[in-house]
């Protein structure tokens, strides 16, 4: 899988350029997000890189916000998260996936890791990363595979009381996350 996409942010003024490359023993995903909250005095640029193993488990995450605030996380893929210096982050224990608030790519991780059958539901603990603050917290999310149409798959996505139906392509990348993100064709 070598793919490049652009997503439009439909909640805020902004967009993301995203690329994913399959290497010998891993995937490398990179994104550059530009968005504005309110007026241009509250504009942000976010760059991130996610190193994944071939089963879509996050191994390493680097995020840089506004060219100077950064976050580096590492994971063993079994629910243990570490800072750059190797220090364990206890409050994230048990979470397997990341959810970076400013990108729809995060949804691809649990979707691509599982072999879904129609009407199957999966429950996940996610490391939620709030952008631009880089605050970390563990959150529960669920996906239910509800429909397919050719190469398109539809999932009911839920986090706490929020629920929506998202559409992904054959690579598991978001095409439509209603009123939040839409892929530019």
Residue ranges and their predicted role:
Residues 1-17, 23, 71-152:
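Solvent-exposed helix/loop surface patches that form functional interfaces
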Residues 8-12, 66-68, 86, 158-162, ...:
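Short strand-coil-strand connectors
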């Amino acid at each position: 899988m070598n793919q490049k996409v652009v997503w439009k942010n439909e909640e805020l003024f902004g967009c993301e350029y995203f690329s994913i490359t399959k290497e010998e023993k891993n995937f490398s995903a990179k994104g550059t997000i530009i968005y504005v909250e309110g007026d241009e005095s509250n504009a942000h640029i976010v760059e991130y890189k996610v190193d994944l193993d071939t089963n879509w488990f996050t191994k390493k995450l680097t995020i840089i916000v506004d060219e100077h605030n950064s976050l580096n996380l590492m994971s063993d893929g079994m629910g243990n998260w570490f800072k750059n210096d190797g220090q364990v982050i206890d409050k994230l224990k048990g979470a397997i996936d990341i959810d970076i608030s400013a990108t729809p790519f995060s949804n691809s991780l649990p979707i691509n890791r599982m072999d879904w059958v129609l009407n199957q539901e999966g429950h996940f603990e996610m490391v939620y990363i709030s952008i631009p603050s880089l605050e970390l917290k563990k959150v529960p999310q669920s996906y239910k595979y509800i429909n397919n149409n050719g190469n398109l798959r539809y999932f009911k996505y839920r986090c706490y009381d929020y629920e929506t139906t998202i559409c992904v392509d054959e690579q598991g990348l978001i095409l439509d996350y209603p009123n939040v993100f839409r892929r530019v064709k």
